[in-house]
Amino acid sequence: MTHELISLPYAVDALAPVISKETVEFHHGKHLKTYVDNLNKLIIGTEFENADLNTIVQKSEGGIFNNAGQTLNHNLYFTQFRPGKGGAPKGKLGEAIDKQFGSFEKFKEEFNTAGTTLFGSGWVWLASDANGKLSIEKEPNAGNPVRKGLNPLLGFDVWEHAYYLTYQNRRADHLKDLWSIVDWDIVESRY
């Protein structure tokens, strides 16, 4: 199976100023493209040659895992945003967040803290288990909650390439601003 670079569901400048056009061009067009290209090269002749991304991320190690993890992570990341979205989740996901975290604001605070305190590069995820129980997962480097049998719902990239062109070392500010472009309909559909 050949893995493809996903198409963005919006124009490259649509998420500005939260995610600048230049950041999207580098992040999607160069970083993600490289992960996809490397993954396709690395899986040739392996047990993963015809596997889907989730399976590869769950079962692989080393370079295959790193490139598959980053491909899966970025596919989820780029498709969860839309210009003019934001707000709070509704429906079952909104209810579960309120129940488990006390309120949406408390959830955001805990999520942002997880993202700002993750040392080095990685991801912070809202994930659910098979019973719908939510958790905030800090994943270093290319990690994804699927490795723990969890379903990733919402992921914020805390690798510096995700924010440095606009925010420099202000990771916390970037995380706070991302909430204004989250498409909760997409995130809810993953729950």
From Swiss-Prot:
Mn(2+) binds at residues 27, 74, 157, 161. Its EC number is 1.15.1.1. It catalyses: 2 superoxide + 2 H(+) = H2O2 + O2. Binds 1 Mn(2+) or Fe(3+) ion per subunit. The keyword Transcription does not apply. Its cofactor is Mn(2+); Fe(3+). Keywords: Iron, Manganese, Metal-binding, Oxidoreductase. InterPro entries: Mn/Fe_SOD, Mn/Fe_SOD_BS, Mn/Fe_SOD_C, Mn/Fe_SOD_N, Mn/Fe_SOD_N_sf, SOD_C_sf. It is an enzyme of class 1 (oxidoreductase). Pfam families: Sod_Fe_C, Sod_Fe_N. Fe(3+) binds at residues 27, 74, 157, 161. Inhibited by hydrogen peroxide. One of its GO terms (molecular function) is superoxide dismutase activity. Homodimer. Destroys superoxide anion radicals which are normally produced within the cells and which are toxic to biological systems. Catalyzes the dismutation of superoxide anion radicals into O2 and H2O2 by successive reduction and oxidation of the transition metal ion at the active site. Belongs to the iron/manganese superoxide dismutase family. This is Superoxide dismutase [Mn/Fe]. It comes from Porphyromonas gingivalis (strain ATCC BAA-308 / W83).
